[in-house]
Amino acid sequence: MRPLILLSNDDGYSAPGLTAVRDELARHADVVVCAPAVNQSATSHSLSLHRVLRLLEAAPGVFAVDGTPADCIYVALHAGTRVLPRRPDLVVSGMNHGLNLGADIFYSGTVAAAREGALRGVPSIALSADAGASLPAAAALGVKLALALHRAAGQEGRRPAPLLNVNIPAGSSWPVRATRMGARLYTEEVIFRRDPRGHEYLWIGGAGVRHDLVPGSDTEAYDAGAVSVTPLTLDLFAAQHEGIAGLLAAELNDGPIP
């Protein structure tokens, strides 16, 4: 039986990156797309709990949800056979138009879709490519990595489900590195403007980017022109701060903190 792969993204169900990955995956697996109806970049792992959602079958095996990437994976995995004929063997998110390096993973809808899959026990991989990358080459490499993850996860029966974040730099041929999260720092800005009626509005974010040196990191790999494959954890417990939590608990148990 061919593996069943659930494919999503945050750029929208008709995005070129998703189409390229879908076409490449379809050579090796059965693919069902469940992706946002419109661009949902930087929506992180939000779920739409306070409004109705719409599910549209845009084409056979291609579903659009008017919600976030995490909504899409949630709907696909919990809607019975409305979307998927059975439980998928793998969740693939991407190919994202743009990178998700370092702390980008906390904002990325692409990574969040994969994370939602892993939270539900399905091996998952997020794929992102630099705007200067050859999309056919990036899709081919991303699919090779996705299928390798499927084989490795199936053989080892890993629990919890593995979650990988892949970033592909500009170009069409790359070495591949196993990496850790790096440090990607942006020029933070709040830009205020006024509309034609005199009402104030603002834009947040900044265009300038620099990478701090973190040996063995995804940012280091990107700067060297290599593909980064970064395993992510669903357990956010910070052992290095366990002592602080213990101190606060002890002080509260002994009496109010002065």
Curated annotation (Swiss-Prot):
Positions bound to a divalent metal cation: D10, D11, S41, N96
Localization, UniProt: Cytoplasm
Primary location: cytoplasm
Record keyword Metal-binding present: yes
Keywords carried by this UniProt record: Cytoplasm, Hydrolase, Metal-binding, Nucleotide-binding
Gene Ontology MF annotations: 3'-nucleotidase activity; 5'-nucleotidase activity; exopolyphosphatase activity; metal ion binding; nucleotide binding
Cofactor binding notes: Binds 1 divalent metal cation per subunit.
Named cofactor requirement(s): a divalent metal cation
InterPro entries: SurE (IPR030048), SurE-like_Pase/nucleotidase (IPR002828), SurE-like_sf (IPR036523)
Substrates-to-products reaction catalysed: a ribonucleoside 5'-phosphate + H2O = a ribonucleoside + phosphate
Bridged cysteine pairs (disulfide): none
Keyword Nucleus: no
SUPFAM superfamilies: SurE-like
EC number: 3.1.3.5
Cellular component terms (Gene Ontology): cytoplasm
Function, as annotated: Nucleotidase that shows phosphatase activity on nucleoside 5'-monophosphates.
Entry similarity comment: Belongs to the SurE nucleotidase family.
Protein name: 5'-nucleotidase SurE
Native source organism of the sequence: Sorangium cellulosum (strain So ce56)
Encoding gene (name): surE
